[in-house]
Design a protein with these regions (language model features):
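Active-site-proximal helix-loop-helix substrate-binding element of RNase H-like nuclease domains
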Residues: 4-6, 14, 57, 62-77, ...
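A structured, charge-rich N-terminal accessory region that forms the first stable segment of a protein
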Residues: 38, 44-47
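A short alpha/beta connector and helix-capping loop motif
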Residues: 46-62
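Short, surface-exposed beta-edge/turn micro-motifs
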Residues: 33-34, 52-53, 86-87
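Accessory DNA-binding and partner-docking regions appended to nucleic-acid-acting proteins
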Residues: 145, 152-154, 164, 170-299
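Conserved short loop/turn motifs at secondary-structure junctions
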Residues: 43, 117-121, 251-252
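Short glycine-rich anion-binding loops that position phosphate/pyrophosphate groups of nucleotides
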Residues: 42-43, 95
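N-terminal accessory regions of nucleic-acid-interacting proteins
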Residues: 1-36, 40
Length: 299
């Protein structure tokens, strides 16, 4: 069992429906709250094929809040909460959270003040663990944990809330130093640029950037590489399995050495170490490779 070395935190609200989130947003307006500390937990291809946002954890200066995004689903109130211009989101190293929001929810997170941006401007180490009462190794364990299981384990929720409760204090200290150095406007502008950046990706078209040595491949191998990349996505979706567990990049590179044998090479790699009962049938490999070849734009 993972245990953080800090005292358990109280959770004031656990929000798992759109009406509950709307009520919380109304409460923020009633209290004239203009900033919340915010963080996100989820899965990026370590538990399932599809990326998923599990929760948002918030602290508004008075209440600690868990928003169960996985249970609630992608609702208009959630997108409004994340983009409400009247509420600044104080975050740490928010680019990946914005990537997830844009790709999973279809919205960005704004406006943001990113503590990591401030640390870089002040030439300070870019980290948050030193400010929190938790060891970096423990923090890494929580971040690698399965946040998709329900109910969420109490120690996971405790970690999540503890992660945001101190962000206001940290940000105020950073902001004071930035103002003294005449860097506060740059801090705000660079934080805003992260929100405005387009992080949306098409996993099927990512082979040019991610397939090993793609630019150096001969044209026949580039065609095979594109198809193999899309094939891995299709097979991952079929089995609801993270693609990295299905075929490593090294294995994909090996499968295109002889484009004429790509299908048989894929079948061999997919079944490496599998029992007879768990073999991936050749017909399934051929079906998805043909579809991948078509999707990737190959003639």
């Amino acid at each position: 069992m993972i245990k953080a070395e800090h005292q358990p935190c109280r959770i004031d609200r656990y929000i798992d429906s759109e009406p509950a989130l709307e009520a919380y947003a109304e409460a923020l307006r009633g209290r004239r709250v203009n900033a919340v500390a915010l963080d996100m937990e989820g899965d990026q291809g370590t538990v399932r094929y599809a990326y998923s946002i599990s929760i948002l954890q918030c602290f508004d200066g008075s209440e600690t809040v868990i928003i169960d995004v996985l249970k609630m689903g992608n609702q208009p109130a959630l997108r409004h909460f994340l983009t409400d211009p009247a509420v600044i989101k104080v975050m740490f190293s928010c680019a990946n959270d914005i990537f997830m929001a844009q790709n999973m929810l279809g919205c960005t997170i704004a406006p943001v003040w990113d503590i990591a941006v401030g640390q870089k401007l002040l030439n300070l180490p870019t980290n948050i663990s030193d400010y929190l009462n938790i060891d970096k190794k423990q923090k890494d364990k929580f971040q690698r944990a399965n946040w998709l299981k329900r109910p969420i384990r109490p120690e996971f929720l405790d970690y999540a809330v503890n992660d945001v409760m101190q962000l206001f204090t940290i940000e105020r200290d950073i902001a004071t130093k930035l103002r003294a150095a005449g860097l506060f406007d740059i801090y705000q502008n660079e934080s805003a640029q992260i929100s405005e950046k387009d992080f949306v990706i098409d996993h099927f078209r990512h082979y040019k950037a991610k397939f090993p040595g793609y630019d150096r491949l001969r044209p026949p191998q580039q065609k095979a590489a594109a198809a193999v990349w899309v094939f891995r996505e299709l097979i991952g979706k079929h089995f609801d399995c993270p693609v990295g567990y299905i075929l490593s990049k090294q294995a994909m590179a090996a499968c295109i050495r002889d484009p004429e044998r790509t299908v048989s090479s894929l079948e061999q790699e997919l079944n490496r170490g599998r029992s007879a009962k768990r073999r991936v049938e050749k017909g399934l490999v051929e079906k998805y490779y043909q579809e991948a070849f078509r999707i990737s734009g190959n003639p």
